[in-house]
Amino acid sequence: MGIVDEFQALKAETDADLLAMQVGDFYEFFAADARTVASVLDLQVSEKSNHGSSYPMAGVPVDDLTPYLAALVERGYRVAVAEQSETDAGDIEREIERVVTPGTLLASTDADPRYLAAVVREAGGDWGLAFVDVTTGQFRVTRGADRADAVTELYRFAPAEVLPGPALRGDDDFLGVLRERTDATLTLHDAGAFDAGRATHRVREQFGDGVIESLGVAADGPVVRAAGAAVGYIAAADEGVLASVSRIQPFGGGDHVELDATTQRNLELTETMTGGSDGSLLATIDHTASAAGGRRLAAWVTRPTRDRAELDRRQAAVGALADAALARDALGDVLGEIYDLERLASRAASGRADATDLLRVRDTLAALPDVADALTTTPELAESPARDVLARVDRAAAADVRAELADALADDPPKTLSEGGLLQAGYDEALDELLAAHDEHRAWLDGLADREKDRLGITHLQVDRNKTDGYYIQVGNSETDAVPDGEDGAYRRIKQLKNATRYTMAELDSHEREVLRIEAERAELERELFAALRERVGERAAVLQDVGRALAEVDALVSLAEHAAANQWVRPELVAGDGLDIDAGRHPVVEQTTSFVPNDARFDASRRFQVVTGPNMSGKSTYMRQVAVIVLLAQVGSFVPADAARIGLVDGIYTRVGALDELAGGRSTFMVEMEELSRILHAATSDSLVVLDEVGRGTATYDGISIAWAATEYLHNEVRATTLFATHYHELTALADHLDAVVNVHVAAEERDGAVTFLRTVRDGATDRSYGVHVAALAGVPEPVVDRARGVLDRLREENAVEAKGSAGESVQAVFDVDSGGFVDDAGDDGEADDPEAAAVLDELRTVELAETSPVELLGTVQAWQDRLED
């Protein structure tokens, strides 16, 4: 069987997108795979002949596979890797050892988490979700009540790969939303892996017999099915990767602030509405020095906690660090030099760590005492909970690992095991003996050239080595007459060059054989010693991951303190129950780029629902987002951008701010808006913060007003959530006279000599001006259009009819005709745009003969008219 035939046979065994097959010192790709890889990785394509046919071929050196593999997988490809081995008979065999996928890639160059997600929906409606980050060993599971819950968590975790359960594979709506809101690769894993029996066995096998009971979920429920499918998928792809995953943790709505996917987007927590990270809340407050610290801060921002004790602990730590500038600087310097210990530990546990990885483990553990010293010797941190972070790790075990690595590893190890020189002298007696013998032979070889020059009396002689000729003596052709050819010390010619001749001799051959034997034995022994060392480190991966998480937490706390100190943020007072009082609050992102006008926000039992009016572009949306972000930051454990803040803890933050058509899901702007509103009305509680902006604007005016009015009443009377409701429906301001906790506030503007100035100040009371035409002028709309708009606006204010009923009873939009001075329907027909039924009643009223109609008959007629009008 030819190489290409073998490649194609192996490719048929896997459903991976690409196959990398080891052929000697290279991993080769053939046929269509070669073209794909060459295009993605910018490799040269050559041709390989096979049975008279020619096939494209591209390859990478064995020692360089990892970065190329990562580049392919990070672009969404699943790559099978076939290794070669030699049998006892000397034959070469190849078989697929692993499949590397977007969710099982260990060697990721991206600092962000890299989750594999499995999602299960049961017939009863419950959802189960499992999220595994094999690069750090994290495995988290949760239950969802509906599709919105599932989408929220998938948006939050942003997995690299998703395994939808059998019931979801035909759910086009769910899959469409998943493709739209994440960049995940969708993989249809073996449906049997989601079976309750197989999944339960997998979970218990990986985490222990009692683990399911500790999770508090049903053994045959969707959570365990999702977890088991994820474990099975990883095992099928690469069994070794599972060694990094030793703990499984549940999470649920009760331990964190609910932030649905819409809210995360609207508040621009990790990316802006345009898709980039610059300008997001996280990018603004992230001053972390390490990749792990950045991941920890991102987790806090996207999953704020409801744990009051944890919030108090974080706030106290941030406050103390904010007052300790020298300690922050010292910690920043140390943390900036450490490596990603969580990921390094996972690679060690899976058997994938190389010498450089272990060297980085050693250096990171060596920094641990420096971090501890900065935390414990700084007076400002004497009572700080920041000190307690490192108390939660086994520093003695970590010190043992560091000491063993320091004794074992050379300071500058080679890139690959085959090069040798990984381990220090004195680490292993047998290795030291081999190295000493090797040095003796090398010393003889190093002195051979000078000895032969002296013996033969020539100058152009050198001793060297290459893969083809081994060790050789090279003599310039002008001096070859001096080369000995007798029995004693005779040279044997091995290659003729243009200007020189290469020779060997019996004594050189003997030393070469010994050098090669020693090098082979040394390489094999070093591989064994290194593998044993790596295994011992991997066995303590849990300790190392704990240390990595502790360092990440310190880094995140220092980052929050740095931002608080640099921007004059204050520690908010956290209280149970409702109530929100912010003095001179600011938006944390906007204040970085513009001169910001601070605003107060006051919410209590008598003003927990605030209707916000004001001109377009005046800052209503910024103000409302500002309030929401300040509340969120408080429950991250951060200080907040304000002069003072008293914040009642919330169980969720829900927003509906703007909407775009979701064409992939076939849903219009208004449908998206109503779905988001429905989610809020069902999910929010009296402990929630709700932010609504322009509800009802996606439909006809009267429909929109009606929906906004009814939603306001429901939120006020039934949900009783703290609410900000921005609107241009000025009719809603009348609700303040009818609902006891509704108040009106507005963003002020000043109009003088036809010019409008937006003051950005929030004041009590309502406004009935939107200044939309003024905004159009600011946006550069042509002056004739703006002038015409002003004229239409003036006439519209005189006649308030906007919508009418058509002749067939359907709703139609009425359009004001400035030239005629009246309204026409949307077909352009002149008319009063009144209800035809009402017009008929009016006609009958005009013809009633009052003098000839008895009071009883008149009463009956009026009753009939009323019935007709109500219908």
From Swiss-Prot:
This is DNA mismatch repair protein MutS 1. SMART domains: MUTSac, MUTSd. ATP binds at G614, P615, N616, M617, S618, G619, K620, S621. Signal peptide: none annotated. Transmembrane segments: none annotated. Gene3D superfamilies: 1.10.1420.10, DNA repair protein MutS, domain I, MutS, connector domain, P-loop containing nucleotide triphosphate hydrolases. PANTHER family: DNA MISMATCH REPAIR PROTEIN MSH1, MITOCHONDRIAL, DNA MISMATCH REPAIR PROTEIN MUTS FAMILY MEMBER. One of its GO terms (molecular function) is damaged DNA binding. CDD domains: ABC_MutS1.
